[in-house]
Design a protein with these regions (language model features):
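Ribonuclease/tRNase effector modules and their secretory precursors
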Residues: 1-158
Length: 158
């Protein structure tokens, strides 16, 4: 499948097309009010070397595949739907993390309030010490609210 078929005509503030998830939507997951942040969908644009899918693929693609994911898009969808912790990042970013005690599958997101979404800037598989000293915004390992538009499929890597 040509990669252009994985994008919608909707674009980010830089004109970069949003990537579609496995259900054909530009919304990969959601941050809800219960998470102590402004509620909005999580989206990722094709981007370039500074942000988005292209940035993650160039910097962390091999590492992501080495950790059981077939594609970077699969990794982004998995973390967006399954994060169990949110940490304060640098400046105005947040880290969405799926923790397992060995490493954290992490997405760096930033709120674009006027456009109404959380934008994936970067991501990768990091040592658990990476975010240890960052401020925790949300922990939902036992009380995660249901994710809108989820069909209950487990997107864990095989």
């Amino acid at each position: 499948m040509d990669s252009k078929n994985k994008y919608r005509l909707a674009t980010d503030e830089n004109g970069s097309p949003f990537v579609l998830n496995s259900k054909g939507s530009i919304d990969f997951g959601y941050i809800t009010e219960e998470m102590n942040l402004p509620p909005a969908p999580i989206r990722i644009a094709e981007g370039d070397e500074r942000y988005g899918l292209m940035h993650i693929e160039q910097r962390h693609g091999n590492q992501i595949r080495d950790n059981g994911f077939d594609t970077t898009v699969e990794f982004v969808e998995y973390v967006s739907r399954n994060f169990d912790r949110i940490m304060q990042g640098n400046r105005d970013s947040c880290l969405l993390e799926v923790t397992d005690g060995k490493h954290n599958d992490t997405l760096f997101v930033r709120l674009f309030k006027h456009q109404g979404y959380w934008k994936v800037i970067s991501g990768g598989v990091f040592n658990i010490r990476y975010s240890k000293k960052k401020k925790e915004i949300y922990s939902g390992s036992d009380n995660r609210p249901p994710q809108p538009a989820s069909d209950g499929e487990d997107l864990a890597p095989q």
